[in-house]
Design a protein with these regions (language model features):
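Extended hydrophobic/aromatic segments used for targeting, binding, or gating
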Residues: 2, 10, 204, 209-246
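A general structural detector for well-ordered alpha-helical segments in enzyme core domains, enriched
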Residues: 4, 29, 177, 227-234, ...
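Receiver (REC) domain switch/active-site residues of two-component response regulators
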Residues: 39, 209, 265
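Terminal peptide-recognition signature
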Residues: 43, 181, 211, 259, ...
Length: 319
């Protein structure tokens, strides 16, 4: 996040927190976000555990296991400590003294020891080797070395991946945890993943500064409530008390018009700019954003409105 801040010092920046199972790590990430000049914290509710993604499973697609996409963590001092603790504990066996185990432990055991079961043979495949090299290449963040050879020999790069997979999320997240975030940062808190008006009410009662209606782009549950269906009820429940951000399924400017007309304060995009990035890099992202804004402008004109403030339910008709 510090590198992003340096690259775009004048831009508005939000830090999206995936609530880790380590509170020390959560606190560290939020402190870094505030120190780097972020304007608000987005607490993610829609991915407290990963959904059943059959295509990802079929393709064995999880870049995190290759050390990709975890730079926010490998640049964190608390995460570094977790990684080093993991490597120090690797291979160690917890031993308990006889006195601690009680009198029964002092009796002689005449049972012959069982032969240790042999470990299954390790099969090195080209894909496994390639994955190991990728992890090593990303390992400089935790080893401090840019030498591929040293990173291949070090246990830290692999331990970083294992640590990330272990602490990345917590299914046990509750409403009470929001109070911790207030202790860790003074930045405004946006709650992302609201699709039910009752949850919007609870969010307001918890004192959040904004609500983000999202189903994580439909990636978590195929049969999830469409965010556009959730927006009107949530907007009525919020009643203008806090801003509402909207995403999931937005592909063009006309989608933005509909969301704004139904009460969204702001609209976020995900896949469209990723498509542009994949096709043409930075220029592709710029073109996608330009096209969305152009379609937004033209759609408003065709609907007979001249400003976003004029957009309301009156410009829509239920199909």
């Amino acid at each position: 996040m510090e590198a992003v801040a340096d690259a775009a010092p004048a831009g508005t920046r939000l830090f999206q927190l995936y609530w880790s199972s380590s509170d020390e790590l959560n606190a560290s990430l939020l402190r870094r976000a505030e120190a780097s000049g972020c304007d608000a914290i987005v607490v993610t509710l829609d991915t407290h555990l990963l959904g059943w993604r059959t295509r990802d499973l079929d393709l064995a697609y999880l870049p995190f296991t290759r050390g990709l996409g975890i730079a926010q963590y490998t640049s964190d001092p608390v995460f570094h400590q977790l990684v080093r603790e993991r490597t120090r504990g690797a291979g160690s066996v917890s031993r308990t003294s006889l006195s601690e185990r009680g009198p029964a432990a002092n009796t002689q055991d005449t049972t012959p020891p069982r032969a240790a079961e042999p470990n299954p043979p390790v099969k090195l495949t080209p894909k496994a080797v390639a994955a190991g090299i990728r992890i090593a290449r990303k390992g400089s963040a935790v080893t401090g070395s840019k030498s591929l050879r040293e990173n291949l020999r070090s246990p830290l790069p692999r331990a970083a991946v294992e640590t990330f997979l272990e602490v990345f999320s917590t299914p046990a997240l509750t409403w009470d945890d929001l109070a911790k975030a207030r202790e860790w940062t003074s930045l405004p808190i946006i709650l992302k993943g609201i699709v039910h008006p009752d949850d919007a009410t609870r969010a307001l009662d918890a004192g959040v500064d904004a609500i983000w209606i999202s189903n994580h782009g439909g990636r978590q549950i195929d049969q999830s409530v469409p965010t556009l269906a959730a927006l009107p009820e949530v907007e009525r429940r919020v009643g203008g008390r806090v801003p509402i951000v909207f995403d999931s399924g937005v592909r063009g400017g006309a989608d933005v018009v509909i969301a704004l007309a139904l009460g969204a304060t702001a609209v976020a995009i995900g896949r469209p700019y990723a498509y542009g990035l994949a096709i043409a890099g930075e220029d592709g992202v710029r073109e996608v954003v330009r096209n969305i804004l152009a379609e937004l402008d033209i759609t408003m004109g065709l609907a007979g409105v001249t400003s976003i403030d004029e957009l309301d339910r009156g410009v829509l008709r239920e199909a």
